[in-house]
Each structure stands twice: as structure tokens, then as C-alpha cells.
Amino acid sequence: EAVGMSSQSDIRAGYLPLLIGTKYNHNLDENINVPAGLTPIPGAMALGATWNTNLALSMGEIAGAELSELGVNLYVGPSLDVADSRSGAGSGGAGLGAFGGNPYWVGEMIRSFIVGVHRGSSGRIAFVGDSFPGLGSADSGSGIDAPVINKPLEELVESDLNPYRIVTKSSYGSEERIDVLMP
């Protein structure tokens, strides 16, 4: 059962809600202007630099409440990428769109942000991660050419997949459940 989206009986009866999604990340994506009336939120790297999961939770609550008011029930983003210092911002790496370069803290910050989105929307918003494991260290952006991730599998599993593992855990604390759709 998706949290707050519909009941099990509705799904069995063939009813699924229309998903209205957005990739709009408030100010988490520096390439998107914040529409009038919505609260500007620090960029992902700035928020991640605080290492403050309570702040990420609060920012998620703001995003969840405002997007829910607009009728959005599918949140695409923020990026689950881990910034890699070996790939510059111009190459295709995550750059400022990532919460940081430490896989553990990236996962914890994103997880807190998602819990905040769920709380702020009263469980009415599902989440889809805005990336694919390893793109934070790719040699080119996916819009330019097929990205190549020059890492051994072991390193990819240790670093880039860690935020996905953290976010897809079954619960946060004892009362929250996180719904995540993987690309």
C-alpha cells in the first residue's frame, strides 16, 4: 500500500489515483527558479554541508506541504548522487545538485528530506529518486553522451549505491515508512 495515496481496497477495485508529478526541487536544483509564493530552500550541496538531518527534515516538510497544496502527489528528486571530486562540475558529475561527497551523509540527508516531504504532505506524496547510481561520478552528462562511470564495481557498490540502500530501508525511526520508486 502506498502511504496516503489510496487504500488496499481501492487498489483491488482497480482504482489508482492520477499521478501528478514534478521534478521541481524548490531551490535544490539551481537551474530552476522558485515560482512566486513558494518558499526558497537552500540548494542540495548547501543543505548537505550542514550535516543536519533535522534541517533536511524541516526543508522536506516545507516542500511536501507546498507541493501537496498544488496537487502534486509524485515528487521526482532530489538527486541521490554522491558528488565525486574526480569528476568536475562541468563533466557530468553531480556537482552542486548532490547533497555531498560522503555516501553515508548523502543517504541520511536525503532520507530525512523524504520523511519531511511525507510529513509535510500528510503522506500524500510518493518519491522517485532523480538519478541513477553512479551518475555523480560519470564522465559526461546523460544529455550530452552516454555517461561512463570509471569505477570498479566494488567502489560503485560501496559509495554510489549507499544512499539508495539508506533511502529504501523499510522505516525511519519507528513510525515512518518511505515509499521510493527506483528508475
Predicted region positions:
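Glycoside hydrolase catalytic-domain context in secreted enzymes
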Residues: E1-P183
